[in-house]
C-alpha cells in the first residue's frame, strides 16, 4: 500500500513555500524511500493469482467479448502486459514510493503514447490513453513505461545490455526533463508540447524516413479514413459496415439503442458552449458496438456516426462512447474526487495532455448508471510500431515517451519536489533498470500462466 507522508505545518508544496524549500523537501523524501529502493521487485507470499485478478475484471464486462480479450493477451508477453494493468497496479502498490503524487496515466505502457492532432490541427506527441488515470505516485507510471520498453526490447531480440541502455535512457530522460521543468514557470509548463519539429530533432537521422511515413499515416487517419474503413453506402444512407464480433449493429428492438441516444443528448451538455454549438450542426445517422484495444475489450463501447449539412454527401464525424470503469489504481490510490469515472477520465486527460480532443466529454447510462466518456474515434491519430524498431530507434522513442510523461507529471505534480527527490545522478535510473528486468520476468511468468489457464479450460480465449 502507499506509504503516507506527513508534510511540515508550513506545507512545502504550497504557493507560500520557496523554490529552495520545495526542492529540499523533495530531497528529504529520500529518507522515506531511498532512490535505490526502486530497484526492488519480489512477489510477496500472499500475491493473488493474476488469473483471478483478470477474471474479477471480466465479471463487469460483456461476457461474449471476454474471450477476445484473452485471445489478444495470449499473443505475446507484451500484449499480456497491455491487458494486465490491474495485475501490475496490484504489484506496484507494494513497492516503495516517495509520497509525491501526480495525475497518473495509470497505464503508461509504450503503446499508450502516440501522435494526434490538436484542435488547431497541429500534430503533437503525447500520452493518448486515460482509462485508468487517477492521482497516484509518479513511480507507478515511470515503472510501467520502462517495464514495457524492456519487454519490447527483449521480444525484439536485443541483448541484455542494449535493453538496459534503452530503459536507462528513458529513466534518465524523465529525470532530466523534470529537472528542467523545475525551473520553468507554471505557464511555461502548461504551454509546452512535443510537436513534429521536436520529434525530428530527437530521433536519429536513420529513423527520420520512418518518422515522416508515420506522420503522413497519422494525418491520413482522420474522419475520411474512418468512413472508408468502417462504413458503407446503402442507397443514399451511410452506415457502419458490420464486421462481427468486432463491429456490429444493435438490434432495432434493443433498448440499448434508446440508451445510447439518451447518452448522446446528455453528453452534449458536458461540452463547452462553443463546441456544443458546433456539435449541434450534426445529426445521428447510425450506431454500432465496437471492440477496442486489448485491456479495454469487454467494456461497453459504441461508435456513433454523425452527418452534417455543410456539403454534398454530408460532413461526417465518428464519436466513440466508451465505458469508464473503476480505475485499476483506485484500490491502492483512493477513489476519484469526481465521483464519476467518465468525468475522471476527461479531467485527467485535460490536466495531463498538451491539447485534448475537441469533442471530449462524458455521460451516464440512463438505466444502468454506468459511466462513459466520449471522444472522436479517429482524428489524425498515429502510433509507431515499436515491434519494428531497431535498438537505436526504440531507445530514442522511449526517451520521447519519457519526456511526454515527465511533462504530464510536471503539469499536475510539483516538479521542484520531484527534481529534488530524483537528484542529478543516475541512482534512480539504475534502480528503474533493475526493477524493469525483474518485473519483465514476472510478466513473462504471468503470461505463461494465462497460456496454461486457457489450455486447461479455466478461461476461454478467442483468437480472431
Which residue ranges define each predicted feature?
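General secondary-structure propensity
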Residues: 7-17
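Positively charged, low-complexity intrinsically disordered regions
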Residues: 4-7, 345
